[in-house]
Amino acid sequence: MDKRHILMLLAVIIISVAPLIIYSGHGEDDGYFGGADDSAGDAITETGYKPWFQPLWEPPSGEIESLLFALQAAIGALIIGYVFGYYRGRGESSE
C-alpha cells in the first residue's frame, strides 16, 4: 500500500475511535445523547398542547415502528438510486 493510503487509514481510525475514548460513559446520565425527538416532545407537552387528531393505526411495539422506519428508508433509497441510475444511463446512451 502507498504511504498516503496508510496515513489516511490511520486518520480515519483515529477520528472514529477518539469520540469513543473521550466520551466513554460520560454524559449519558446528563442527557447529552437524548436526541432531538425527546427534547422536542417534552417542550410540546410542557405547554399543555392537545393533539388535533389521533393516529389511524399505532404500531404495537417500538420494534415494529423501527422496522417500518427502516422499510421506508430502504424504499426511499431504492427510488433515489433508480432515478440516479436512470439519468446516468440516459446520459451515457445519448453520447
Curated annotation (Swiss-Prot):
<feature type="transmembrane region" description="Helical">
    <location>
        <begin position="67"/>
        <end position="87"/>
    </location>
</feature>
<comment type="pathway">
    <text>Cofactor biosynthesis; adenosylcobalamin biosynthesis.</text>
</comment>
<keyword id="KW-0169">Cobalamin biosynthesis</keyword>
<comment type="similarity">
    <text>Belongs to the CbiN family.</text>
</comment>
<comment type="subunit">
    <text>Forms an energy-coupling factor (ECF) transporter complex composed of an ATP-binding protein (A component, CbiO), a transmembrane protein (T component, CbiQ) and 2 possible substrate-capture proteins (S components, CbiM and CbiN) of unknown stoichimetry.</text>
</comment>
<dbReference type="GO" id="GO:0015087">
    <property type="term" value="F:cobalt ion transmembrane transporter activity"/>
</dbReference>
<keyword id="KW-0170">Cobalt</keyword>
<keyword id="KW-1133">Transmembrane helix</keyword>
<comment type="function">
    <text>Part of the energy-coupling factor (ECF) transporter complex CbiMNOQ involved in cobalt import.</text>
</comment>
<keyword id="KW-0406">Ion transport</keyword>
<dbReference type="GO" id="GO:0005886">
    <property type="term" value="C:plasma membrane"/>
</dbReference>
<dbReference type="Pfam" id="PF02553">
    <property type="entry name" value="CbiN"/>
</dbReference>
<dbReference type="GO" id="GO:0009236">
    <property type="term" value="P:cobalamin biosynthetic process"/>
</dbReference>
<keyword id="KW-1003">Cell membrane</keyword>
<keyword id="KW-0472">Membrane</keyword>
<keyword id="KW-0812">Transmembrane</keyword>
<dbReference type="InterPro" id="IPR003705">
    <property type="entry name" value="CbiN"/>
</dbReference>
<keyword id="KW-0813">Transport</keyword>
<feature type="transmembrane region" description="Helical">
    <location>
        <begin position="5"/>
        <end position="25"/>
    </location>
</feature>
<keyword id="KW-0171">Cobalt transport</keyword>
<protein>
    <recommendedName>
        <fullName>Cobalt transport protein CbiN</fullName>
    </recommendedName>
</protein>
